[in-house]
Amino acid sequence: MLHVRGLGLPGCLALAALASLVHSQHVFLAPQQALSLLQRVRRANSGFLEELRKGNLERECVEEQCSYEEAFEALESPQDTDVFWAKYTVCDSVRKPRETFMDCLEGRCAMDLGLNYHGNVSVTHTGIECQLWRSRYPHRPDINSTTHPGADLKENFCRNPDSSTSGPWCYTTDPTVRREECSIPVCGQEGRTTVKMTPRSRGSKENLSPPLGECLLERGRLYQGNLAVTTLGSPCLAWDSLPTKTLSKYQNFDPEVKLVQNFCRNPDRDEEGAWCFVAQQPGFEYCSLNYCDEAVGEENHDGDESIAGRTTDAEFHTFFDERTFGLGEADCGLRPLFEKKSLTDKTEKELLDSYIDGRIVEGWDAEKGIAPWQVMLFRKSPQELLCGASLISDRWVLTAAHCILYPPWDKNFTENDLLVRIGKHSRTRYERNVEKISMLEKIYIHPRYNWRENLDRDIALLKLKKPVPFSDYIHPVCLPDKQTVTSLLQAGYKGRVTGWGNLRETWTTNINEIQPSVLQVVNLPIVERPVCKASTRIRITDNMFCAGFKVNDTKRGDACEGDSGGPFVMKSPYNHRWYQMGIVSWGEGCDRNGKYGFYTHVFRLKRWMQKVIDQHR
């Protein structure tokens, strides 16, 4: 296989490709946009041509035919000569005209299998944007810069590192399509490409709100229509039927919402919208209606006005039924080794100060007991750390759905495949008399979890077989109410992420270089929603928020592989409790400039959690 190293990319084409993509929110590009990336840009002079001028190589090898020895005399390096000679021999058949020959040498077009191609096309022949070669989302590549160091696997540009007979290709950003070929111009054959461009027809993925007159406000709370079938096609049970009365006995329904026949309604102000009871487990399902976009939190207010100047009720109110939820909610978020002893951890003040001045802190080794709600989701066979998670009561654990079910990574775990380890500090060592190991009774994944597109509603509940006893190192975190979300989930305010994930993004085979020995902590600022949306071409929904450092920030930090499913928490300055605002969900690489970590918006899915938990009476 011929590997090409050290050749510059054509700058104009790079700018054209990136400019055409950066404003798009589509996974699938429009045909005109996709085809525009295939236009070749001519340059009067180039970095490669400058290299050729060294030692009259241009005259010897471009204007005339040269030998390997003549090229070596000019370049004076076996490695540089091998790189040049590999391209030179491939491109020898298109020496005329000179412009075509230079296109081939500089990798702006493909010859034969396209091993010479080093251009900036980053979309497949069907219009799917390419995945970054260094990223593991949505697909885990088996070809990367470590396995193929000479293949020039930069950004998400199409390449042919494995000598595919179809020519240059890439991993795609579509979770259902692992890899696909790209349409690359063929050298010396105007209008011909390595494979034909056949863009797919896909629906719009714009983040547009429906017109006000065509959508339901308040997530359908006042909906009075006659829809009586759920999104999954299940018939709704009548609200006055015996099974429904039993299921809703302890529900606190809004009296303004009229529960008529078996029509879909939203009597508990569920952020997911209207729903109804059904005959099968978990006993309820959601209905398909068109809701207006009404984001909760993440508004960018002045810190002094929103925190220091606001009178807020600091009294804590429980939300769940203790009979089904278990113990711990009344005392949640108060750490035994800190708040209960009137102590603070070493960066807590800076975290709280961010609500006013927005200072930034790097990651560090966690103090013991700093996150007593942290859970390790552990695979039984082979034994390995799978994900993070969080303890929300003595019976229930919260994690990301993709930790349980994600077909692109061959994940589809059952209760028998997993266990949870609670109270841990060390990543690998068994901590006798401190950690507790618990088996799972039941896994609940959100019925609208969307792994095929964007990991929307990336949330799962784990029911423990036995209640776990609390200790100095085992204690539940609080789940936020609307007031807490409105007060704290604002751009510039900082939350805390904990986990045993990789310390940095790398393809090294030496695991000890990148995996921490103990629990890690990092404080991250919440990012404005428009900035989040502009940072990616993956569709962002109201069930997500993003956090992380911007390009001009002096400090760094991010969640990384292995942190998934873990908590994003914030401390309330009113009642001094810790609330889980988010679940570590996904990101395009770790701590990359212009990229942020995305988190599941816990509050928006809290009513779903309540209804699932209430079935366990």
Curated annotation (Swiss-Prot):
Disulfide bonds join C61-C66, C91-C104, C109-C187, C130-C170, C158-C182, C215-C292, C236-C276, C264-C287, C332-C478, C387-C403, C532-C546, C560-C590. Residues 1-24 form the signal peptide. Residues 44-90 form the Gla domain. Keywords: Acute phase, Blood coagulation, Calcium, Cleavage on pair of basic residues, Disulfide bond, Gamma-carboxyglutamic acid, Glycoprotein, Hemostasis, Hydrolase, Kringle, Protease, Repeat, Serine protease, Signal, Zymogen. It is an enzyme of class 3 (hydrolase). The modification 4-carboxyglutamate is found at E50, E51, E58, E60, E63, E64, E69, E70, E73, E76. Gene3D superfamilies: Plasminogen Kringle 4, Thrombin light chain domain, Trypsin-like serine proteases. The keyword Disulfide bond applies. GO terms for biological process: acute-phase response; antimicrobial humoral immune response mediated by antimicrobial peptide; cell surface receptor signaling pathway; cellular response to mechanical stimulus; fibrinolysis; G protein-coupled receptor signaling pathway; ligand-gated ion channel signaling pathway; negative regulation of astrocyte differentiation. Residues 547-569 are annotated as: High affinity receptor-binding region which is also known as the TP508 peptide. InterPro entries: GLA-like_dom_SF, GLA_domain, Kringle, Kringle-like, Kringle_CS, Kringle_sf, Peptidase_S1_PA, Peptidase_S1_PA_chymotrypsin. Heterodimer (named alpha-thrombin) of a light and a heavy chain; disulfide-linked. Forms a heterodimer with SERPINA5. In plasma, interacts (via N-terminus) with alpha-1-microglobulin; this interaction does not prevent the activation of prothrombin to thrombin. Belongs to the peptidase S1 family. PANTHER family: PROTHROMBIN. This is Prothrombin. The lineage of its organism: Eukaryota, Metazoa, Chordata, Craniata, Vertebrata.
